[in-house]
């Protein structure tokens, strides 16, 4: 009986296998395309019918580290590309992750040349592992620059040489990501960017290379991210002087909407023709230094003026230090379109409440402000007087939302900043405070109670308090017998705590 059941199961499985195997190769390749590349290749051992089906897949993600030896990977790639060239001209997407040693052969240039001559639309080439050292990197072929079908390109730790600048590069390319590469010279990189006539999204992450001045001139670009990756000594071989003394960044892109700086180390920044700018994000350290003929203040003024038409602005602690230093000598350019500002701040409450009104005066139409603060409280008469002496235009007209996250649990400088907004904002609708539970357990409930009981200039203003660590809202409950108000909150372990605040 059991033998009959087993035979029937085998027959049913074979029938199912036969049904799948009889599907057209085009349909089979579409089904396989939803699997990881490793599993796709494994189907080649199922039967003779499946031996070459995986070679018809339009997109593959190949990692040399998943092969027992690099030579095995080389043989596999050579066979695959030969078949692709002869039988599968519809390879549209390819990612190559290369990890090799000093004795491994250099084949990536040839492979890239092969796929660039087809109908490729997405190409991602990256060198990792031991290949951090530049002598292991490989040169991209000239055929890549003239690939007519390529839409998306990512190159990570490769060498890019000169090319024919009289020919439009990559005529269909929409998105390009260049990370930690080495270029033949500055002019070559500049020409590569400007000759991509329909390029919309560009990301550049630089290292200590031979490109001192990065120039981005584009009539089509809508999104740009510029970053810098530094390595500690011993991590990578340095081939160029690490001193960025005469480094610079030039951006001229009239259609640019989104601009991101991520640890940008260029000393001078020239930004022009950015009338379409919507959002600027400044992450990590940023350098704005004096250059020949211009003081640091003048360079900062040029940079701030260049981004002054933005609607959404996110700035790091380092950028806030630049702004703070600038405000000591001059007022900021007017950010007339700015409606959303997010800033990380590390200052005493005295210093921050000194620059905050000056900062807000340059944002007459600001609607929302989010502050991640590390403000050390400084309760002095001067602080109080300064807090109420200056009321910027946006507080009297447009500001509706304030969020403050306190990153220090032992100080209540963030509450001093919150007090400024609550006392002076005419149309404020909501104030959100994100505080550490340890802050609330260290005798600061009275300070919080003062904030909650402040006379609010806006009758619509609501104040919400959250535990910054777990996002739980803090509740206020009134004892029916004593009339006292209790503050309930949860710590990281979500244990219950209660504190009397009145």
Swiss-Prot record:
Coiled coil residues, start to end: none
All residue ranges annotated as the F-box domain in the record: 17-63
Disulfide bonds: none
Per-repeat ranges for LRR: 70-98, 99-127, 147-180, 181-206, 208-228, 238-263, 344-373
SMART domains: FBD, FBOX
Superkingdom: Eukaryota
Domain FBD, chain residue ranges per copy: 384-435
Keyword annotations from UniProtKB, A to Z: Leucine-rich repeat, Repeat
One Pfam family this sequence matches: FBD
Keyword Ribonucleoprotein annotated: no
Protein name: Putative F-box/FBD/LRR-repeat protein At5g22610
Organism of this sequence: Arabidopsis thaliana
